Amino acid sequence: MITGPQMRAARALLGIDQRALAALAGVSVPTIQRMEASPGTVRGVIGSLTKVVEALERAGVELIGDEAISQASGRGVRLKTAPGGP
C-alpha cells in the first residue's frame, strides 16, 4: 500500500511535518512516527493506514506503486497535476 520512505517523501513534497500529517489524517504523531520508521511496506492498524493514505491523496499527493506507469521503475510519490495542467 505505502512504504515508510514514501510517507516521508510525500510529507516533503507537501512541506508538512509529522504533526501536520497526523492532524490531517486524524491519527497520533507516534502513529506517524512508527509508520515512517518502517523500512518497507507499512504494517499496522488498517484504519489508521487508510486515514493517512487518504489524507495524503486529499492534500494532492499521488502514490506510485510498483505496477504504476512511470518513467522509472519502483515506488514513489508525485504531486497531482491540476485539471488542464501540463
Which functions belong to the PLM regions below?
Residues 1-12, 53:
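A short, Lys/Arg-rich alpha-helix, primarily the initiator
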Residues 6, 31-34, 76:
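Residue-level recognition of specific faces of alpha-helices
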Residues 7-20, 81-83:
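Short basic helix-loop element that most often maps to the first helix and adjoining turn
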Residues 10, 24, 35:
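Residues in the recognition helix of alpha-helical DNA-binding motifs
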Residues 27-44:
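Recognition helix of helix-turn-helix/homeodomain-like DNA-binding domains
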Residues 58-86:
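Short, charged recognition helix plus adjacent turn
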